[in-house]
């Protein structure tokens, strides 16, 4: 692909999106698989054992419940590392971009917006992670009661990522991804505190998670992001053509489906909040407990 330099010095990829670009996402997916294997064995296992051993009771490695908790702790360590790293990266990339703070600029210049190489790699990384995530849900991670919902979420996210990239909606796509990862950082941190029986840390992080979910996914996402795709986008699409109409309704339908998932999980979060208040600040079991009814 041909590239040029932007004023900020970051290479800019000309917006000639092609399907073969997603080979990079496939490479990322395989890379995540092998990286997870290495980290699980040599890093996360040791961290999980250390975290669980600092709890109130001595750790029993021959206990099935303890082994299950170690597996879940490693899952959360992996996800925390990924979400925190990705969010830090994309925030660094878009911090100085004027369109990051003005919804009227999300589509300004579309479809001939410049695609920085950093945003392209970020997109392919995220797409690869969710491709890996589908495989991990099927064959690796703890099977939880919301498996079908989570699988549907991952599939829709992959389709939305691919669609927004191929249609050059990558500005608003990067914002959406950053919003989602921010909440997940707090969620995985709260889980790690819970597994290590640090109730105060778990309660604080869960509260931050709930607030961030409400603000980012239930307020900012529908009233800023979906508003932009529903109203601002109309200034750039030819709604008299079949292509423009299909593009408009396809993109917004997928975003609304994500919002439905957000509302569903907010219901579960509210149930957790009720438990937390009843337990006087102690975070209870995750409503999304796994199929074997182990504590999450």
UniProtKB/Swiss-Prot annotation:
GO molecular function: sphingosine N-acyltransferase activity
Gene Ontology CC: one annotated term: endoplasmic reticulum
Primary residence: endoplasmic reticulum
EC number(s) recorded for this UniProt protein: 2.3.1.291
Membrane-spanning ranges: 19-39, 80-100, 121-141, 158-178, 206-226, 254-274
Highest rank taxon of the organism: Eukaryota
Functional summary from the UniProt entry: Prevents cell division in root meristems and promotes salicylic acid (SA) production and hypersensitive response (HR). Catalyzes the biosynthesis of ceramide sphingolipids with C(16) fatty acids, structural membrane lipids involved in membrane trafficking (e.g. early endosomes) and cell polarity (e.g. polar auxin transport related proteins); accepts only C16:0 fatty acids, but with a wide range of d18 sphingoid bases, such as sphinganine (d18:0) and palmitoyl-CoA. Mediates resistance to sphinganine-analog mycotoxins (SAMs, e.g. fumonisin B(1)) by restoring the sphingolipid biosynthesis.
Mutant phenotype after disruption: Elevated levels of free trihydroxy sphingoid bases as well as ceramide and glucosylceramide species with C(20) to C(28) fatty acid, but reduced levels of species with C(16) fatty acids. Better resistance to submergence under light conditions, but increased sensitivity to dark submergence associated with declined levels of unsaturated very-long-chain (VLC) ceramide species (22:1, 24:1 and 26:1). Increased susceptibility to AAL-toxin triggering programmed cell death (PCD).
UniProt-recorded name of the protein: Ceramide synthase LOH2
Taxonomic placement: Eukaryota, Viridiplantae, Streptophyta, Embryophyta, Tracheophyta
Chemical reaction(s) catalysed: a sphingoid base + hexadecanoyl-CoA = an N-hexadecanoyl-sphingoid base + CoA + H(+); sphinganine + hexadecanoyl-CoA = N-hexadecanoylsphinganine + CoA + H(+); sphing-4-enine + hexadecanoyl-CoA = N-hexadecanoylsphing-4-enine + CoA + H(+); sphinga-(4E,8E)-dienine + hexadecanoyl-CoA = N-hexadecanoylsphinga-(4E,8E)-dienine + CoA + H(+)
InterPro entries named in the record: Lag1/Lac1-like, TLC-dom
Topology versus the membrane: Multi-pass membrane protein
Transferase is among the record's keywords: yes
Species in which this protein is naturally found: Arabidopsis thaliana (Mouse-ear cress)
Gene Ontology BP term (one): ceramide biosynthetic process
Cell location: Endoplasmic reticulum membrane
Pfam short name (any one): TRAM_LAG1_CLN8
């Amino acid at each position: 692909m041909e590239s040029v330099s932007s004023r900020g010095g970051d290479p800019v990829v000309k917006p000639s999106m092609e399907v073969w670009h997603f080979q990079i996402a496939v490479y990322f997916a395989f890379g995540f698989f092998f990286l997870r294997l290495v980290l699980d064995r040599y890093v996360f296992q040791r961290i999980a054992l250390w975290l669980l051993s600092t709890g109130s009771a001595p750790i029993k490695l021959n206990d099935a419940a303890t082994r299950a908790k170690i597996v879940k702790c490693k899952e959360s360590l992996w996800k925390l590392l990924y979400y925190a790293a990705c969010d830090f990266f994309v925030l660094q990339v878009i911090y100085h971009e004027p369109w990051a703070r003005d919804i009227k600029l999300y589509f300004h210049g579309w479809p001939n917006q410049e695609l920085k190489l950093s945003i392209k790699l970020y997109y392919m990384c995220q797409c690869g992670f969710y491709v890996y995530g589908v495989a991990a849900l099927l064959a690796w991670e703890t099977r939880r009661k919301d498996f079908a919902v989570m699988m549907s979420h991952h599939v829709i996210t992959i389709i939305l990522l691919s669609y927004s990239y191929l249609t050059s909606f990558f500005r608003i796509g990067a914002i959406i991804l950053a919003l989602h990862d921010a909440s997940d950082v707090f969620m995985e941190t709260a889980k790690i505190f819970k597994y290590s029986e640090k109730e105060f840390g778990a309660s604080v992080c869960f509260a931050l998670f709930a607030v961030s979910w409400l603000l980012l996914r239930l307020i900012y996402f529908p009233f800023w992001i979906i508003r932009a795709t529903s109203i601002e986008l109309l200034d750039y699409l030819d709604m008299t053509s079949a292509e423009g109409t299909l593009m408009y309704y396809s993109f917004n339908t997928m975003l609304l489906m994500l919002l439905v998932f957000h509302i569903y999980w907010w219901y579960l979060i509210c149930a957790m909040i009720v438990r937390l208040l009843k337990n006087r600040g102690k975070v209870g079991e995750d409503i999304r407990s796994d199929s074997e009814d182990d504590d999450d």
